[in-house]
Structure formats: structure tokens, C-alpha cells
């Protein structure tokens, strides 16, 4: 017999029992997609060992949902091959909003979707068992996939000692590390969304492919809710709203490099000002490092060897330079300008750095995927014993920042990869436990992604949920044991000896451009007052009211309220509609009555009207709304 733990309860099972055997002892086991066995994602068919700790995953868990969607991608590929046997499947990953699969030798349109969806439904109803198969070596794998050059390329690049697995359902077998659902049966609702052109490995010089996007759910009800969400997302598209609200534009002369307009810069500056205040109070010092630095620096950091294809490089006076794709190396150089003692730690250094990374043109998308952006990085230098407390400090900062925007989030801890890491086992264990303990103390929901950390340390990713329940990966907290060693950073420890510091690299907004895009969609362009590009628009009834309107606008501006006067020769109702379309928070109408009483007629963008408001009361109310960073109107 073996003994395992599940949900802090002990179970006794016969030798050779699987996670599925354990699941049979649980309620609602039909909902289980997979399992975390000793924090490793596994299939339910996995054989358990004595002492294992098991946690079952469902659709409601991010890892369980990914397993479900990955199986759905395989169902898509199987359905396509049943209908077009000559098609060549390439890759089919899970993405934020579902999954896609790329095919070569296939020509279809959305008119073919009903046939594919019907076949996918049939595959699910066949309740095909899904099993994991491990090939004996690369030669066997290459022989099996000999008619698919794309799979051959992927297999050839694998290390000789790699374990190569595939998943089989019915007649279909595909390369995959898994895990997968135990059968196709749980996929009750399956919908294809769109097709697009793609290139093998995203490289325009390689083969053209067709990409089919899809989504799947355990129930039809959830699918209907998701399709409604997609319709709502179209209304919130930041690219459309960015144009309509005159916030930013894109130019063909600089693909992937947005132009911010004056109204967009108001929001930008509000974000930056808030960030600076928050970090000053949290004990951060701000620096600025150059955008252009020599090849020698990037060789020390490792970027020249491992990231050069994503960097913009040039030669000046016969010396190679690169525009920085990341802020970290510049901060390392700043650290070395002074001697440091453990008494200074944690030493918190922040920078809003302007970085450039080459993205393929097909991957560019509004503010979400660009070639130039500003990253709100900070590097915290500390001793190993300080990691847990400082991580908790950062998590508290995360909570305050995202709470200010009304954004909920969850956290993901990525642990040590199986191979290719630096640092001792003891240091990895200490670092991982410190991050995990800080997450527990933060009392925010988090998941563990085993083996998904960087080679130089574990990390915490911050996944933000917007107003229509989409998630976006924004901030990150990365423990780095690599760069301090590469740059030979030192501090004097309590024994008076030189030691290498641990470094926490963290970003809260992540890309500020991307975060702004998320905010545009989250608020649907209806920004809270403190972020709004136009707080007040003053509307005159006739020309004789112009002087009073200008007087008020000047006064409000002096008080720190962004106010404009609509001088257009249009009706009052048209001016009001124009202001509401531009999502101006408050409109003030000046007519004969207001001129006489010196009081205000105020209208909100929600069309609530408040008459006879004194200038003093309105000003004080608006200033308090701005000061408090309120998400709702004060009037």
C-alpha cells in the first residue's frame, strides 16, 4: 500500500494506483482536468508514489483550464484532419482567450467553420480516451512524423536526452508534453472564432500557414456568456476608442511605435505622477539610464548572445551599440558607482525606462504589442534573509496600485526549471520558499506553475482581471541570482566581507503603453476624473456668455482642473452630445440665468443634471474627487 495526501487528508491506496483512482474517492471527480502532484502538473493517469501530495485541478483553476483548452486544440486538429486529411498540423498553443492551431497545406474560410465544429462535437461525443505515449528516442519520433516537416524541425531541435511525449485520442496523435484531459468527453461546447494568415515560427521568410482560433467550455451556458463577452470586448477595443477619443495614433512610418496625442498625454502623465508618488512613499529612489549602450555591456549581461535578434543595433565610430531592450543592465552600472553595505539594504532603485524590442509586424497590435514602450522597472538589492519581507512589501504595493484602478488580480508563482539553472540548491529552495511565504501572507489567491521560472530565479507574475473578466499578465516580481554575478556586484556583509547581493527585479505596470491600453478597455474610455483628459467642458448658450465661460475656465485651470470652452457655433444639445461622446466628466452650461446668479448648471456624462451649484462648492467637490483618486463621480 501507499499513502498520499490530498486536501490535507491522508489516503491509503494500493501500489500502482493512479491519480484517477484517488479521484474516484472524491466528490465531483468528473470535473477534474488533471492534478498537481508534488506541485507538478500531471495527467490523471499518472501513477502515484508513496508520500505524494495531490491537488486536483478543475476548469475553475487556471492550470485546469489550460489543460482543458489544450485538449480542445487537439480536438480542433483532429477535426481538421478528418475533413482535410492532407492538411499538416504544426503547433496549437493555449492563449489568453482560448487556443489556436496552425496548419500548412490547408485552404479554408469561415464558411467551413460549421463543418469543423460539427466534427469537433462528434469527436467529443465519441468520448475518446486520451493517453500519453513516450517515444524511445528521437529516431523513433522522427520516423513517426516523417511526413510532417514542421514536426521534424521541432523534434530535431530537442536535446538528445529529452523525453519526447505525444498524446493519442482515437486515430489522432500529436507531439505534446501535456498534461491533457482523460478523454474528449468533457468538451461540451466548442466554437471557432476566426482565421488569420500566419508564418511558421512567426518568420515572414518561412512557410505561410493558416491559423484557426477557437474556444471551448464545459457547458453551452459558459460558451454563450463568453461570446457575449467577446461582443462587449469589440465595443471596448482600445484601438477604436484611442482614435475616437483622440488619445493616440499609429503611423506607417514607425510601425509598432505609437504617437500619443495631447489628450493621451494627460492620462500618461497622470499615471506617471501617481507612480512616482507611490514609489517615493515606499522608499524607492528613481534613476534614469541611457537608451544607447555599447555591445560590451550587452555581452556582459548576456543579451548580445541570447537576445540580439530582438534588439536594434547600430555602429558608431566603428563600435557596435544597441538600443536597450531592458533596463536591468543600466541599473547594474548605477549600483557599481558606489560602495555598498548591508546596512543600506533593501536598496530600492526604480526607473521608468524607454526600451525597444523588435517584434514581427504580424504580432503588432495597438498599444498591447509594440516595438517601443516604457517599463516601470525597479531593482531591489538585498540579502537572502530579506527576500520574504521585501517580496511582501512589493505585493502590498501591487495591491495598492491595482486597487487604485479597481482592478482585481491573481498571482502565479513559477518555480525552478528542471535543467539549466544557476545557483545552489539551497539558495533556490530558500528563494522559492521566501516568495511562497510572502504570497501566503499577502492573502491573495495564487497558483504555482512548477518549472516555469527563469534559469536565474523563481518569479511571481501578476494577472489582472478587467471589467469584462479578461485576464492580462502585467507586473512581475523576479528573483535574479544571475545579473549581480555577471556584473560582479558586491556589498559589505556584517562580517566585513564582500558578498554578492540578491536582486529582486519587479515591474508593476509592466509596459505602461500596454497598461494604458488595458485601462482604456477596462473603463471603456470613461476614465475616472483623476485620469480623464478633460475634466470639465463649459458650454455657452449664446455669444454673450463667452466671457463668463472663459473666466470660469481660467479659474478652474488655476485650481488644477482641466477645463475647456466649447466655442463651436452649434446648438447646446449638440455641444452636450459632443462632450458626452468624448467622455468629458462634467459639462457646465452658461446661459442668461447662470450669468445673472453666478451659479452653475452642471451635467454629468451620465446625463444627471444639477442646477444652482455654487462655483466654490463645485470646485471643492471636484478637487476632492481628484485628490482622492476616486473611481466614481462625486456629484
Curated annotation (Swiss-Prot):
Recorded GO CC terms: cytoplasm
Entry function: Catalyzes the attachment of threonine to tRNA(Thr) in a two-step reaction: L-threonine is first activated by ATP to form Thr-AMP and then transferred to the acceptor end of tRNA(Thr). Also edits incorrectly charged L-seryl-tRNA(Thr).
This enzyme's EC code(s): 6.1.1.3
The keyword ATP-binding is assigned to this record: yes
Name the UniProt record assigns to this protein: Threonine--tRNA ligase
Quaternary assembly: Homodimer.
Gene field: thrS
Note on how the cofactor is bound: Binds 1 zinc ion per subunit.
Gene Ontology biological-process annotations: threonyl-tRNA aminoacylation
Region (Catalytic): 237-528
Family: Belongs to the class-II aminoacyl-tRNA synthetase family.
SMART domains in alphabetical order: tRNA_SAD
Pfam families: HGTP_anticodon (PF03129), TGS (PF02824), tRNA-synt_2b (PF00587), tRNA_SAD (PF07973)
Top EC class, one word: ligase
Coiled coil: none
One of the record's GO molecular function terms: threonine-tRNA ligase activity
Annotated source species: Chlamydia muridarum (strain MoPn / Nigg)
